[in-house]
């Protein structure tokens, strides 16, 4: 696989989602290199620690959900410097992956055993719309907390604001702490809302609205979407080796 092959794969995989969101903002490259790519590493975030792990595994190409954040001062500059020094290319894909049929929200829902997805995460007029899934049979809130904790490999925070069992689940992976999103879940009659970040306001509003709330980490609520993308890449280019560059549970 080379960079042209990869570009063609991304275009065919994401289609018009690439037109909906801005290149070099919501998806793009750091240090793109013309070379045959054999070893591909993947994870959620681009950080100096991730690049160091990639170097240790002789990775040539890193795929992440997030680019290095500009507001983490000097981090992106350091990442680009290390990518260049170690001759590693990097590709990130953010909102198109969030909204893809196989993307972050749907992949998390599938990971916790959801029976059917009834609403796809998407954007309308620049506003995010939550994903919704349903179980065929309701489960206890405590069982869902255990499922999410096991899937993410970390303790999660949970607020039981209703005694209802869980059948209908609303989710936005990553930074889904907006009260607007929680209100969507409430108005859709979801029994629980799952996300990857919280604030005082999200916790207070969920309690006021009487909707159960489960919060994992931003990083690990979103890794399943990246993994789904890389599995598709491996199916298209069987000669590549894929390596999970697992990050620290620090949130």
Question: Where are the model-predicted features located?
Answer:
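Active-site catalytic microenvironments in core metabolic enzymes, especially phosphate/sugar-handling
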Residues: 1-251
